[in-house]
Amino acid sequence: MFADLIPRLRDAMPELRGELQTNVPLAPWTWFKTGGPAQCVYVAPDVEDLAYFLGNLDPDISIFVLGLGSNILVRDGGIEGVVISFGPSFHKIVIEGDTISAGAAVADVKLASAAAMAGLGGFAFLRGIPGTIGGALRMNAGAFGGTIADILVSCEGLDRRGALHHFTPEEMGFSYRHCAVEGIIFTQGLFAGWPENPEKIREDMGKIAQERAKTQPVNTRTGGSTFKNPNGAKAWELIDRAGCRGLTLGDAQVSELHCNFLVNRGKASAADIENLGEMVRQKVLAETGVELEWEILRVGRPPVAHKTSR
């Protein structure tokens, strides 16, 4: 258990409106359904309260923003400091002409659906990404031939002091699964599409959904794509070549359907999953000479002592 931060935070920010919770289990918040607790969770109701929170937070207290929990592994020792969760105002979508404004907590698939209803093309690829707009901006999320960089007009976010910043696509410095902007909590993005037949868009989204269901372990306890594709190669092919398809450690397994996915078959600890991923990396390096880079974000502390689940 962590020490209770709430009294300290309340003293430092008496006008805070957002909810504070202490020692919050995070396993239910993540798609892997495992991992330790958060020392403190702050639910930000809006940008103004988030800015106030950041502006009055002790700089020695660490922060981490948690969205849908789809591309993250929380280690078994939990996350020290404050985990920030977005409240309702960050879920808003506003459509004006060919542009769509979306809050950081908007699910990628919801933005894709809103664009389809408005007859705006360019967003269908988001149907294949299990995350939120904030996370998509952070890692230049992409799938099925599209990336967030392709549709971004501008975005904004807060720094650690609570100051608001605006960014153009050029200032974001996008590259493969990466943006160059650091130390910013993205709060909103403005995106642009083009007029397209809504039925055509829905048809494209349906094909993406079918392809995901056929080739990926959807509706399982997984964190999505585990490793980034190396230059000129596909991670899953290298993993398969190294003989890792179906490899297990405790209740953690390399998916037999798509071997760039790790799955929790029931009672896997976060350590089981991370250690299995490291085993895969070692085997791929030995077999192919390629060192795979984690795409899943691993955060938090390992436990003091750990026994592999049986």
Curated annotation (Swiss-Prot):
Might you give the EC number(s) for this enzyme? 1.3.1.98
Q: Name one GO cellular component term.
A: cytosol
Question: Which Pfam family is an annotated match for this chain, by its short name?
Answer: FAD_binding_4
Question: Which reactions fall under this protein's catalytic activity?
Answer: UDP-N-acetyl-alpha-D-muramate + NADP(+) = UDP-N-acetyl-3-O-(1-carboxyvinyl)-alpha-D-glucosamine + NADPH + H(+)
The protein's GO terms of the molecular function aspect are:
FAD binding; UDP-N-acetylmuramate dehydrogenase activity
Q: In which pathway does it act?
A: Cell wall biogenesis; peptidoglycan biosynthesis
Q: Please name the SUPFAM superfamilies in this protein's record.
A: FAD-binding/transporter-associated domain-like, Uridine diphospho-N-Acetylenolpyruvylglucosamine reductase, MurB, C-terminal domain
Q: Which UniProt keywords apply?
A: Cell cycle, Cell division, Cell shape, Cell wall biogenesis/degradation, Cytoplasm, FAD, Flavoprotein, NADP, Oxidoreductase, Peptidoglycan synthesis
The FAD-binding PCMH-type domain sits at 34-211
This protein's cofactor list reads: FAD
Any one GO biological process: cell wall organization
The places in or outside the cell where this protein is found are:
Cytoplasm
Source domain of life is Bacteria
Q: Which residues form the active site?
A: R177, S225 (proton donor), E295
Q: Which family does it belong to?
A: Belongs to the MurB family.
Entry's NCBIfam families?
A: murB (TIGR00179), PRK13905.1 (NF010480)
Q: Which function does this protein serve?
A: Cell wall formation.
> This chain belongs to which protein, by name?
UDP-N-acetylenolpyruvoylglucosamine reductase
